[in-house]
C-alpha cells in the first residue's frame, strides 16, 4: 500500500484565502441583479413565515383557513350587493305594475287591473304599503303624480295676487285676456268688466253651480281673477245660509266659507237602498215556504231656495233620477216641502224638513152626490224628517243619517193634530249623495 502524504498550507496563507473569499462575496452582493434581489426578498418572507409557524399557539389549520375566509368574505359581499340590486329592481317593477293597475281600475278595465294587481303582489306582497301617493284636488289624476310638491302649494296660495300683478294695462283699460290668434271677430276681452261678471253669474246660476265656475277659472288668468270675485261667493253663501252668515269669522274669505262650512249639495240627489226579507203566503204544500226579498229606494233632492223633494219607490235610480230635475214632476208619490239647516252646540249640522204629498185638484163626482149621508172629515197630513249631515270617504257632506221621522195629521174641523213617531231602526239606511250632470246642464236664472 503506497504511503499518502498530506500537505497543509501554512496558517498565514489560509487566513489570506478566507479574507479573499469574504471580499469576493461582498463584491458579489454589490453586483447582484434585480432578479436576485427579488429572490432574496421572497426568501426573507419565507423565513419570517416559517418562524411564525414555529411560534407557540399557531396551528397550520388557522393559516390554511385565513386565505379561504378572506375569499369567502369577498364573495359574500359581492353576492349581497347583487341581491340588493335584484330586490330593488323587483320592487321598482312591482311599483310600476301596481300603478298601472290603479290606472286601469280608474278607467273601468277591472279585469286588466286585477291582472296587474296579481303580478305586482307576486313580486312584492306588501307593495301597496310601500307606495306613497296623493290624489289631485279633483281626483282625476290617478297614476300621474304621486308625490306632492310643497313649493307648488306655496305658490298656489299667492296665485291670485300673482295673476293680478301680471295683468297688462292698454289704453288705460284693464285687459283680462288677450286673443291667442288674430281674428276679424270681436274678442271677449273687449267686453267691460261688469258685463263679464254678469256672464259669470249666469254660469253659477240660481242652482249654485260653483263647480262650473271653478272649471271656468282654468281658461286664463283673467277668468281666474273673475272666478275669485268675493261678491259671487258672498251671494252664494247668503243663498245657502241666509242671515246666519253675515259675519265672515272664522273663515278668511267667502269662498272658504262656502267650501268648508257644512251644507247640503244641490248638484245631485241623495239616495239610499233598503233590503229586507219577508215571509210569503202559505201554500198547500207543507214542504214549501215562500220568502220574498223586498228592495226599495229613498230619494231626497235639495234646492238652493229651501225646497226639498222626497220619494220612496221600488224603481231604480236610472228611471227616477231624471224625473227629479225640477219640482214640476209628474210622479204621484213624491213629497214636497221645505228644509232648514241647524248647527247645534256639539258642532253637528242637522237638516230638518217638513214635507207633504203633492196636492191634486180632483173633479167633483156628481153621480152619487145625493146618496152621501156622512161627510168626510178633512185632514192635512205632513211628515217631519230629521237628518244629520256627515262626510264620508274623500267627499264632503255626502251622507245623511236618519235621526227623526214622524207623521202629523191635522184635522181641519177641530184643529187637533195627531203625531205618530216612527222608530229609527236598521230599515232607515243612510242616504249617500250622487252627482247628476244633467241637473246643471243649463241655467234658468242668474245668481
Swiss-Prot record:
Pathway: Protein modification; protein ubiquitination. Pfam families: F-box-like, FBO_C. Keywords: Cytoplasm, Phosphoprotein, TPR repeat, Ubl conjugation pathway. Residues 26-35 have a biased composition (Acidic residues). Residues 9-36 are annotated as: Disordered. InterPro entries: F-box-like_dom_sf (IPR036047), F-box_dom (IPR001810), Hrt3/FBXO9_C (IPR045464), MIT_dom_sf (IPR036181). The modification Phosphoserine is found at residue 136. GO terms for cellular component: cytoplasm; cytosol; SCF ubiquitin ligase complex; ubiquitin ligase complex. It is found in: Cytoplasm. One of its GO terms (biological process) is protein ubiquitination. TPR repeats lie at residues 94-127. CDD domains: F-box_FBXO9. GO terms for molecular function: ubiquitin-like ligase-substrate adaptor activity; ubiquitin-protein transferase activity. Residues 185-236 form the F-box domain. It comes from the Eukaryota. The keyword Zinc does not apply. SUPFAM superfamilies: F-box domain, MIT domain. Overexpressed in multiple myeloma leading to constitutive activation of the PI(3)K/mTORC2/Akt pathway to promote survival. Part of the SCF (SKP1-CUL1-F-box) E3 ubiquitin-protein ligase complex SCF(FBXO9) composed of CUL1, SKP1, RBX1 and FBXO9. Interacts with TTI1 and TELO2; when TTI1 and TELO2 are phosphorylated by CK2. Substrate recognition component of a SCF (SKP1-CUL1-F-box protein) E3 ubiquitin-protein ligase complex which mediates the ubiquitination and subsequent proteasomal degradation of target proteins and plays a role in several biological processes such as cell cycle, cell proliferation, or maintenance of chromosome stability. Ubiquitinates mTORC1-bound TTI1 and TELO2 when they are phosphorylated by CK2 following growth factor deprivation, leading to their degradation. In contrast, does not mediate ubiquitination of TTI1 and TELO2 when they are part of the mTORC2 complex. This is F-box only protein 9. It comes from Homo sapiens. The lineage of its organism: Eukaryota, Metazoa, Chordata, Craniata, Vertebrata.
Amino acid at each position: 500500500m503506497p504511503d499518502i502524504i498530506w500537505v497543509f498550507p501554512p496558517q498565514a496563507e489560509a487566513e489570506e484565502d478566507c479574507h479573499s473569499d469574504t471580499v469576493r462575496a461582498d463584491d458579489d452582493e454589490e453586483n447582484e441583479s434585480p432578479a436576485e434581489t427579488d429572490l432574496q426578498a421572497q426568501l426573507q418572507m419565507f423565513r419570517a413565515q416559517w418562524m411564525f409557524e414555529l411560534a407557540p399557539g399557531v396551528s397550520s389549520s388557522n393559516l390554511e383557513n385565513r386565505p379561504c375566509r378572506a375569499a369567502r368574505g369577498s364573495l359574500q359581499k359581492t353576492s349581497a350587493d347583487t341581491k340588493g340590486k335584484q330586490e330593488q329592481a323587483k320592487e321598482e317593477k312591482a311599483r310600476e305594475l301596481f300603478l298601472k293597475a290603479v290606472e286601469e281600475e280608474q278607467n273601468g278595465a277591472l279585469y286588466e287591473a286585477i291582472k296587474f294587481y296579481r303580478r305586482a303582489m307576486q313580486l312584492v306582497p306588501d307593495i301597496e304599503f310601500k307606495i306613497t301617493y296623493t290624489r289631485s284636488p279633483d281626483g282625476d289624476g290617478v297614476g300621474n303624480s304621486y308625490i306632492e310638491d310643497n313649493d307648488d302649494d306655496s305658490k298656489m296660495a299667492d296665485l291670485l295676487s300673482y295673476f293680478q300683478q301680471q295683468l297688462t294695462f292698454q289704453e288705460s283699460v284693464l285687459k283680462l285676456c288677450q286673443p291667442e290668434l288674430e281674428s276679424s271677430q270681436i274678442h271677449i276681452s273687449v267686453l267691460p268688466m261688469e258685463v263679464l261678471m254678469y256672464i259669470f253669474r249666469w254660469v253659477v246660476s240660481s242652482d249654485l253651480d260653483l263647480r262650473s265656475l271653478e272649471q271656468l277659472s282654468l281658461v286664463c288668468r283673467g277668468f281666474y281673477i273673475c272666478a275669485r270675485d268675493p261678491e259671487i261667493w258672498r251671494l252664494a253663501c247668503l243663498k245657502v245660509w241666509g242671515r246666519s252668515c253675515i259675519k265672515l269669522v272664522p273663515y278668511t274669505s267667502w269662498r272658504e266659507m262656502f267650501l268648508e262650512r257644512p251644507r247640503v249639495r244641490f248638484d245631485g240627489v241623495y239616495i239610499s237602498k233598503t233590503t229586507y226579507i219577508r215571509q210569503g203566503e202559505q201554500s198547500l204544500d207543507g214542504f214549501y215556504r215562500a220568502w220574498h226579498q223586498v228592495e226599495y229606494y229613498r230619494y231626497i233632492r235639495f234646492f238652493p231656495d229651501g225646497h226639498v223633494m222626497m220619494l220612496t219607490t221600488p224603481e231604480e235610480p236610472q228611471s227616477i233620477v231624471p224625473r227629479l230635475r225640477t219640482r214640476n214632476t209628474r210622479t204621484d208619490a213624491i213629497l214636497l216641502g221645505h228644509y232648514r239647516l241647524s248647527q247645534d252646540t256639539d258642532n253637528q249640522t242637522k237638516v230638518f224638513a217638513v214635507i207633504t204629498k203633492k196636492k191634486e185638484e180632483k173633479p167633483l163626482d156628481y153621480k152619487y152626490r145625493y146618496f152621501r149621508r156622512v161627510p168626510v172629515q178633512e185632514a192635512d197630513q205632513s211628515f217631519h224628517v230629521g237628518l244629520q249631515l256627515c262626510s264620508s270617504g274623500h267627499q264632503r257632506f255626502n251622507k245623511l243619517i236618519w235621526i227623526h221621522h214622524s207623521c202629523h195629521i191635522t184635522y181641519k174641523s177641530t184643529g187637533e193634530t195627531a203625531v205618530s213617531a216612527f222608530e229609527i231602526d236598521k230599515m232607515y239606511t243612510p242616504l249617500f249623495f250622487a252627482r247628476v250632470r244633467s241637473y246643471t246642464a243649463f241655467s234658468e236664472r242668474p245668481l
